[in-house]
Amino acid sequence: GSAWTGPDGLTHAGPLIDTVDGVDLISCELCGFVHVIPLPEPEAAAEHYKSDYYTETKPTYLSHATEDAAWQRVLHNDLLLMAETILGSSQRTLVDIGCGPGLILDAAADRGWTCSGLEPSRQAAQFAAERGHTVINAPFTPDVLAEIGEVDLVSMINVLEHVPHPFDFIDWANQLLQPGGLLLLTVPNDFNGFQRTLRATGATDAWWISPHHHLNYFSFETLENLVKSHGFEPFLRTTSYPMELFALTGRNYVAEPEQGRGCHKDRRAFDLAFEAAGLSHVRRTFYERLAQAGLGREATNIAQKP
């Protein structure tokens, strides 16, 4: 195994899972999930998302966000519907942590939620604010908790894989939630069975390991264990289209990135077809069952605070 002792004196140790770009990934016994060692300082990580994430790392993200809006809306509606079913109709306040351009806020506002967002990136926060949302342009720290106030739902979509201290994020989210409130988490579903198959057959490398952007690598189980360790009760799992299916059936977008846009278009068409048919429950059931099998591109969990 490998080990690293952080500035807080805690030792992260466990079996070495992989080494990519000179960075080790371990299955950490202390944390209960796979992460890189050494972990960067929280300040350095926060700085990256404040300044250059949307200009340098994802320069086309905001323009694609608009292009994908109708499709994203369908997926956000699915998530919000699940939350509404658990919460009941009177509880409709949410904060989206790392809200980016605010697409889930658009969906929530249209469904009658009172919503706000927190976003460290200036451009993305501005993009969301220009469309009428209440957005706090700051990283997630204890300093912003009072400003956000108590809510019924805290969502963090594709956030936890980026942060050096996911335990703190769950703890702060817990402080924002009323009793019975919900935590909605989405992270990449990494080292899943489809990915391992592609790698084992030599069709791809471990493309999902990106140690400079993704510090933490979760499965449905390790994500659920993380929330359980904070007293949350995992309620429901779901996922998104298993993109690896394309690579397993002759369209290897990993080895041939030029296939990527076409695959994305087709997965979008898949999700939208059920909408056009008035059968969106079929899509929801499909993704919930896939998640039960540990498959799908993302791991989404809705957990309840006692």
Residue ranges and their predicted role:
Residues 1-157, 166-172, 236-239, 260-276, ...:
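Conserved N-terminal segment of class I S-adenosyl-L-methionine
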Residues 177-183:
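Short glycine-dipeptide loop
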